[in-house]
Amino acid sequence: AAPLVAETDANAKSLGYVADTTKADKTKYPKHTKDQSCSTCALYQGKTAPQGACPLFAGKEVVAKGWCSAWAKKA
């Protein structure tokens, strides 16, 4: 499996990525809600796995309970 994205990665920081959706910056991202997570995002490729690929972080994986500002509701 690919390595996990670190919250300290430059790309992760620019997107406000957190490994735990409950820790998202509510000041910077007021539209964030706790039911938003990588696992409910259209970009998440991990299906039901605890972690999976995301096209925004090439060569790395995100955790299912994570979140970033690019979150888009699964269709």
From Swiss-Prot:
This entry's Gene Ontology molecular function terms read: 4 iron, 4 sulfur cluster binding; electron transfer activity; metal ion binding
- InterPro entries, alphabetically? High_potential_FeS_prot, HIPIP_sf
Q: Name one GO biological process term.
A: aerobic electron transport chain
Query: What Pfam families would the database entry show?
Result: HIPIP
What are the entry keywords?
4Fe-4S, Electron transport, Iron, Iron-sulfur, Metal-binding, Transport
Tell me which residues bind [4Fe-4S] cluster: C38, C41, C54, C68
Gene3D superfamilies associated with the record: High potential iron-sulphur protein
Q: From what superkingdom does this record's organism come?
A: Bacteria
- State the family it belongs to: Belongs to the high-potential iron-sulfur protein (HiPIP) family.
- Give the record's subunit note: Homodimer. Monomer at different ionic strengths.
- Function (record text): Specific class of high-redox-potential 4Fe-4S ferredoxins. Functions in anaerobic electron transport in most purple and in some other photosynthetic bacteria and in at least one genus (Paracoccus) of halophilic, denitrifying bacteria. Competent in photosynthetic electron transfer to oxidized cytochrome bc1 complex via the membrane-bound c-type tetraheme.
Tell me the protein's name: High-potential iron-sulfur protein
State the organism of origin.
Rhodoferax fermentans
Q: Which gene encodes it?
A: hip
